[in-house]
């Protein structure tokens, strides 16, 4: 009799077989599920505290996705030989799992919940994110914790005009899209994607296809819950204090209504703060017993009701716009004198200062990924300091949100970057958010595109991004173009679309409610396209095309090709030749296995000198050609003559002169410069030379020949 009560469910999902197990591993967690998807194995665990902390006013959910190097049969490369801080991929995957599960916890549930996912085994063809999403959903569903799931998730590719479910990494290379969709049986909750300028119809089709296929996983989770689910918690949302709600409404309603007639963000925020303080003071004066956190929640609900009802009634939005208008845009290029490229992009009260730096191949980021190491020649980093929203706060290493926003902006721009052959530079873009009132990641896309073009990067097209919002009450809904920060917090959807005039390059969607239909998404995509075209027009006015030349402060790259067999000659013994070349010419030289050499220098004369010397080193000795070189060594039977760097030939004693030569030193000395002709080379590469072939014969010899 086993001590384990193991339950297993398997299903075929596209080209993969998926197995879910519970009851054997991590039994002390509230819920634990192991998912095996064709050799990629993940363990998801969920633990929830039975009580919320007193005074808790938010839902403390943490999601940690952790990759173990043993999963790929590797030992960590760090000094300590153990896993360290999360990689960017781990952070992004943690966010990917958090986003669709967070809205499914009931309102008022403030107990701490921790979801931890370990990647235990990795098939390089099957990334860990989709199995991790499925395992997390299953672990939450069997745990008994209040959770309105399960959710399913799927990756969708677009290959040869067809949607492909959960493609392998190799297949993704041929795809024009990499899209992840997650949701319940009834509704899509999250979309994350990048694409190669695809139409709205193709993108929406992928979302619908992925959602349909995700239901296969949801059905399997339902079966697992039926056989292994724990009793559902007897949890009730805290009862609402209706008399206090009515009192707060009476005290604050008119004041907050007036505050939301103020168009300036800072003035409006200040008016709301005053209203909050007045309500607290009035409640104290009336002797009402209340919890400050609870009252703040009530005031937030009043704000949401005011804003949402105004929009659904067709009234102007918070800042006076209608639902389709983009805020005023100002663009300035080349704002920083000594950077390689820069742009200041301002849209309303959101502003991004974006700077591009060009580097050599050595500057590319080397990524030690679990599925294999690779180099990334395009980096985009997003920073949002607290002053951007007029606040004080911590300044330091990037938070999860900043990493996520940077990745979204990067996804948007990748599709239009030149290839390495077209533009061999490494590119780093940094977006400094200097003001924020909604959609700073999309401002980073616009500013990033302009900054790259300012740096002389030959982009295939301009890319613009726009953030859309949604307000929905029963059958009424309104899609909002270019949402403000407050509209993001108070709305039901955050929907970001980036692309060119030809199509979409990135799409991110986060939905807080059920009931978002395909038709609503269609309206949102069409409205987003209209806004994107408007912004692209402004960007094209400001900068029609990329600068023809890179900045004077950027390194110049010169590319040449050599025979791969000559690489060792350029490098030299122990790197002596390449080291001398770089030091003496003041250049950076990079050599690839196929014989491509990239020379980086700010001085074209130095680069030309490096090219000349490499050409000499790699040149082949030609039969019949005349060379001028120094004698490097005198031998009894001749002399060695240097023809090319690192290449000597033998001048035999019989080839020095027409007359008989008794002693080589009677004619030649070390260091002497002589002209020689190449007679032949043998199979070992040895070169035979002649001096006498270039000399006229003495007259008597000619007469004797005639006789």
From Swiss-Prot:
Catalytic activity: RNA(n+1) + phosphate = RNA(n) + a ribonucleoside 5'-diphosphate
HAMAP family: PNPase (MF_01595)
Binding-site residues for Mg(2+), renumbered to this chain: 488, 494
Keyword Ligase recorded: no
Family indicated by similarity: Belongs to the polyribonucleotide nucleotidyltransferase family.
Domain of life: Bacteria
Organism taxonomic ancestry: Bacteria, Pseudomonadati, Pseudomonadota, Betaproteobacteria, Burkholderiales
GO CC term, one of those recorded: cytosol
Protein name (database record): Polyribonucleotide nucleotidyltransferase
Cofactor: Mg(2+)
Keyword Nucleotidyltransferase tagged: yes
Gene field: pnp
């Amino acid at each position: 009799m086993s001590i384990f009560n193991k339950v297993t469910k398997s299903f075929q999902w596209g080209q993969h077989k998926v197995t879910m197990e519970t009851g054997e591993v991590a039994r002390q967690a509230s819920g634990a599920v192991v998912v095996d998807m064709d050799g990629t194995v993940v363990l998801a665990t969920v633990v929830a505290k039975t009580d919320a902390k007193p005074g808790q006013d938010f839902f403390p959910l943490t999601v940690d996705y952790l990759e173990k190097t043993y999963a790929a049969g590797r030992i960590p490369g760090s000094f300590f030989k153990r896993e360290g801080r999360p990689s960017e991929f781990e952070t992004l995957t943690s966010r990917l799992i958090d986003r669709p599960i967070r809205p499914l916890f009931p309102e008022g549930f403030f107990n701490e919940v921790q979801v931890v996912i370990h990647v235990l085994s990795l098939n390089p063809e099957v990334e860990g994110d989709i199995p991790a999403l499925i395992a997390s959903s299953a672990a939450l569903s069997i745990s008994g914790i209040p959770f309105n799931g399960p959710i399913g998730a799927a990756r969708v590719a677009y290959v040869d005009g067809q949607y492909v479910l959960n493609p392998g990494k190799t297949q993704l290379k041929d795809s024009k899209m990499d899209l992840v969709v997650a949701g319940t049986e009834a509704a899509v909750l999250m979309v994350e994607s990048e694409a190669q300028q695809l139409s709205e119809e193709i993108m929406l089709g992928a979302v619908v296809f992925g959602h349909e296929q995700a239901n296969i996983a949801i059905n399997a989770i339902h079966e697992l819950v039926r056989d292994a689910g724990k009793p559902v918690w007897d949890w009730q949302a805290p009862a609402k204090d209706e008399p206090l709600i009515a009192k707060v409404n009476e005290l604050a309603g008119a004041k907050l209504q007036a505050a939301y007639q103020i168009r300036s963000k800072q003035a409006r925020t200040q008016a709301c703060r005053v209203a909050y303080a007045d309500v607290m003071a009035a409640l104290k004066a009336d002797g009402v017993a209340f919890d400050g956190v609870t009252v703040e929640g009530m005031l937030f609900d009043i704000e949401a009701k005011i804003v949402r009802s105004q929009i659904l009634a067709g009234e102007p939005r918070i800042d006076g716009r209608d639902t389709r208008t983009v805020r005023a845009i100002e663009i300035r290029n080349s704002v920083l004198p000594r950077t390689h490229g820069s742009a200041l992009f301002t849209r309303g009260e959101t502003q991004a200062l974006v700077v591009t730096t060009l580097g050599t191949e050595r500057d590319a980021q080397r990524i030690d990924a679990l599925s294999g190491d690779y180099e990334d020649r395009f980096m985009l980093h997003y920073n949002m300091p607290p002053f951007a929203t007029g606040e004080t706060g911590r300044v330091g290493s990037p938070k999860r949100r900043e990493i996520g926003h940077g990745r979204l902006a990067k996804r948007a721009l990748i599709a239009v970057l030149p290839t390495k052959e077209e533009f061999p530079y490494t590119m780093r873009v940094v977006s400094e958010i200097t003001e924020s009132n909604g959609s700073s990641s999309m401002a980073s896309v616009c500013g990033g595109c302009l900054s790259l073009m300012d740096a002389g990067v030959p982009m295939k097209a301009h890319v613009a991004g726009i953030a859309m919002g949604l307000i929905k009450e029963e059958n009424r809904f309104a899609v909002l173009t270019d949402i403000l920060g407050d509209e993001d917090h108070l709305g039901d959807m955050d929907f970001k679309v980036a692309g060119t005039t030809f199509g979409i390059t990135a799409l991110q969607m986060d939905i807080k409610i059920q009931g978002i239909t395909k038709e609503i998404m269609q309206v949102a995509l069409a409205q987003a396209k209209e806004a994107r075209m408007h912004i692209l027009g402004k960007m094209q006015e400001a900068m029609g095309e990329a600068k023809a030349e890179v900045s004077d402060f950027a390194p110049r790259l010169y590319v040449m090709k050599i025979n791969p067999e000559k690489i060792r000659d350029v490098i030299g013994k122990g790197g002596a030749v390449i080291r001398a070349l770089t030091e003496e010419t003041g250049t950076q030289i990079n050599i690839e296995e196929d014989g491509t050499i990239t020379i980086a220098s700010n001085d074209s004369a130095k680069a030309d000198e490096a090219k000349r010397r490499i050409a000499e080193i790699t040149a082949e000795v030609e039969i019949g050609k005349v060379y001028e070189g120094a004698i490097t060594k005198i031998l009894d039977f001749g002399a060695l003559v240097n023809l090319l760097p690192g290449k000597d030939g033998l001048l035999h004693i019989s080839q020095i002169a027409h007359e008989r030569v008794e002693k080589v030193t009677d004619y030649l000395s070390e260091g002497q410069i002589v002209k020689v002709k190449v007679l032949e080379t043998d199979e070992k590469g040895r070169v035979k030379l002649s001096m006498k072939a270039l000399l006229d014969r003495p007259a008597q010899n000619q007469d004797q020949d005639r006789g």
